[in-house]
């Protein structure tokens, strides 16, 4: 029997939502083992004073299996 755990992270990129997702998964992989899935819970853009997009933020729920 395996047991899974879900952790929520917020990640960002100045390039795109896709880049923010990839950065978040890569960073999670550094500290968590047995990553199984990711759910994109939320997406948000941060705007500068000029109205231009400065940052893409993504909230992810990462599922990983806990080792015995």
Model-derived features with residue positions:
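Short, well-ordered alpha-helical segments
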Residues: 2-36
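Amphipathic, hydrophobic secondary-structure cores in small proteins
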Residues: 36-39, 45
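A cross-kingdom feature marking charged/low-complexity
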Residues: 44-68
């Amino acid at each position: 029997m395996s047991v899974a755990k879900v952790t929520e992270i917020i990640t960002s990129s100045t390039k795109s939502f896709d880049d923010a997702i990839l950065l978040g998964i890569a960073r999670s992989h550094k500290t968590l083992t047995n990553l199984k899935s990711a759910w994109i819970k939320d997406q948000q853009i941060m705007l500068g004073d000029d109205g231009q997009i400065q940052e893409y933020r993504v909230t992810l729920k990462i599922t990983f299996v806990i080792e015995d």
